[in-house]
């Protein structure tokens, strides 16, 4: 009985450590978005603002958070794709 309890507690610790890794990465992505500016020209102001926020997060983290923001990347990327988009 104690062996099963220890195994289940080890599984819980692993899941907690994974969630902590994602939270720390999301914090770094928010910090990196302050230094990177992204946007698209010729669009509505609302779409431009969303492009600046989401673009900074995606560029700052790269592929590390691809699994977390994959859905957001697909939706926003389709809306913001165009020749006048860029980051600096």
Swiss-Prot record:
Q: According to the entry, what is the taxonomic lineage of the organism?
A: Eukaryota, Amoebozoa, Evosea, Eumycetozoa, Dictyostelia
**Domain of life, per the record?**
Eukaryota
**Coiled-coil intervals in this record?**
none
Entry protein name: HssA/B-like protein 11
Could you tell me which species this protein originates from?
Answer: Dictyostelium discoideum (Social amoeba)
Q: Please give the family membership noted in the entry.
A: Belongs to the hssA/B family.
- The gene is hssl11
Q: Which GO terms describe its biological process?
A: sorocarp development
* InterPro entries, alphabetized: HssA/B-related
Pfam families associated with the record: Coiled
Question: By its UniProt entry, which PANTHER family does this protein fall under?
Answer: HSSA/B-LIKE PROTEIN 17-RELATED (PTHR31857), HSSA_B-LIKE PROTEIN 17-RELATED (PTHR31857:SF2)
């Amino acid at each position: 009985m104690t062996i099963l309890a220890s195994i289940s507690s080890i599984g819980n610790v692993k899941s907690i450590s994974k969630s902590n890794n994602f939270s720390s990465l999301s914090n770094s992505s928010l910090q990196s978005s302050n230094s990177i500016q992204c946007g698209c020209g010729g669009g509505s102001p609302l779409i431009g603002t969303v492009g600046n926020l989401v673009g900074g997060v995606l560029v700052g983290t790269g592929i590390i958070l691809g699994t977390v923001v994959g859905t957001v990347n697909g939706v926003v990327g389709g809306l913001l794709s165009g020749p006048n988009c860029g980051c600096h």
